[in-house]
Design a protein with these regions (language model features):
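Iron-sulfur cluster-binding electron-transfer modules in prokaryotic oxidoreductases
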Residues: 1-310
Length: 310
C-alpha cells in the first residue's frame, strides 16, 4: 500500500478524482480485490514528512522536556492524513518535547498479514538501521498509528532474531498517548488546553487492546479539562486492517461493526465526540455510521489555546 499511497499522493488531486469516480473505481478495485463499496482515504497533496521539513523551524516554543521524541511517520499518516501527524507534532511541541520526524520505511505490517515474511524482514531491518543511528539515551520512538508502532514492538524481535539492536529499540517504543500519560500523570500544564464541551466516547484499537489494554487511552483523555469520557465496551470494529476492504469480507465486516458498535453509538443521549486512534477503526466508523471520528491527537490539538500552534 505504501507505494500505492506514494504515487496517489504525488498524483493528487487527479488520483482522488479517479477514486471518487464509480466506474473507474470499480474497474481498479476489481483488479486488486477491494470491494467497490469501500472508499480509499483521499491522498494528500503533501506528505507529513515533507510538511515537517518545511515547517519544523516555525514552532519554536520553549523546550521544557528533556525527552527527544522520534515520531514514526506511518503510511496513512504520511500520505493520506498528514493533518493527524501535524496535530500530533503540535501537541508534543506545546508540551515541551523536541520532536524529529525521520524518513522511514513502511513498518511491514501489510506484508506480515499476508505471510510475506522476507519483505517484512527487509523493511524491519532498514527501519532499525535508521532508528539506531538517531536514538540516544533521552530518546523515545513514538507512534501515531497503533498497528504500525506495535508491529515494531511486537513483531520486529521475532523477525530480527532478538538481536541487541532491536532490544535497544524496543525499550524505547511507545504510543503517543502513553508518552503523555507517563510524563503528565499528575495533570497537563495550566492554560494549555481549552475545556471539552462535549462527551468523549472512545473505541480501542484491537492491536492496542491485545497488548496493553485501554487504561492509558482512558487516562490520556481524562487529562483534558472538564472532560467526560466513556469507553465503548466492544470487540473489533470489523475492519481489521485490509480485511474489511476485501471483496469477500466486506459483508461480514459491516455485520461485525453493526453488531459491536451500533447500539453503543446510537444510544447516546446527547452530542458527543468519538475518538479512535486506529485509522482502520476510524474508516469503518465513518463508512458504517456516517460519523467522523478523531484521533486523540486531533482532539488535543483542537483544544490548544496557544494561537502560534493553530
Amino acid at each position: 500500500f505504501r507505494k500505492f499511497a506514494q504515487y496517489g499522493s504525488a498524483m493528487a488531486p487527479i488520483s482522488n478524482w479517479v477514486m471518487r469516480n464509480d466506474v473507474l473505481r470499480k474497474i481498479l478495485f476489481s483488479f486488486i480485490g477491494i470491494d467497490h463499496r469501500r472508499q480509499i482515504p483521499e491522498f494528500a497533496q503533501y506528505s507529513f514528512t515533507n510538511w515537517y521539513q518545511n515547517n519544523k523551524n516555525l514552532f519554536t516554543l520553549d523546550k521544557k522536556n528533556s525527552t527527544k521524541v522520534i515520531l514514526f511517520p506511518d503510511t496513512f499518516t504520511n500520505y493520506n492524513h498528514p493533518e493527524v501527524g501535524i496535530n500530533t507534532y503540535k501537541v508534543l511541541v506545546s508540551l515541551g518535547y523536541e520532536v524529529i520526524v525521520p524518513q522511514l520505511k513502511c513498518c511491514g505490517k501489510p506484508f506480515l498479514s499476508k505471510g510475506m515474511l522476507s519483505k517484512a524482514k527487509s523493511l524491519a531491518s532498514e527501519n532499525i538501521k535508521i532508528l539506531s543511528q538517531i536514538i540516544d539515551e533521552d530518546s523515545v520512538i513514538v507512534g501515531i498509528e497503533p498497528s504500525c508502532l506495535l508491529t515494531i514492538f511486537d513483531d520486529y524481535p521475532d523477525l530480527l532474531n532478538q538481536d541487541l539492536e532491536i532490544k535497544k529499540i524496543i525499550n524505547k517504543v511507545m504510543l503517543v498517548g502513553d508518552l503523555i500519560v507517563r510524563d503528565f500523570s499528575k495533570g497537563l500544564p495550566d492554560k494549555l488546553f481549552k475545556s471539552v464541551d462535549r462527551k468523549v466516547l472512545f473505541h480501542g484499537h484491537c492491536h492496542q487492546k491485545s497488548l496493553f489494554g485501554t487504561s492509558k487511552i482512558n487516562k490520556l483523555l481524562n487529562l483534558l479539562p472538564s472532560v467526560v469520557v466513556e469507553e465503548i465496551q466492544s470487540g473489533c470494529c470489523g475492519m481489521a486492517g485490509t480485511f474489511g476492504f476485501e471483496s469477500e469480507h466486506y459483508e461480514i465486516s459491516i455485520k461485525i461493526a453493526k453488531q459491536n458498535l451500533a447500539e453503543k453509538i446510537n444510544n447516546q443521549s446527547r452530542d458527543f465526540l468519538l475518538v479512535s486512534d486506529g485509522i482502520s477503526c476510524r474508516q469503518q466508523i465513518d463508512h458504517t455510521f456516517g460519523i467522523k471520528s478523531l484521533h486523540s491527537m486531533d482532539l488535543f490539538a483542537s483544544l490548544l489555546i496557544d494561537d502560534r500552534l493553530n
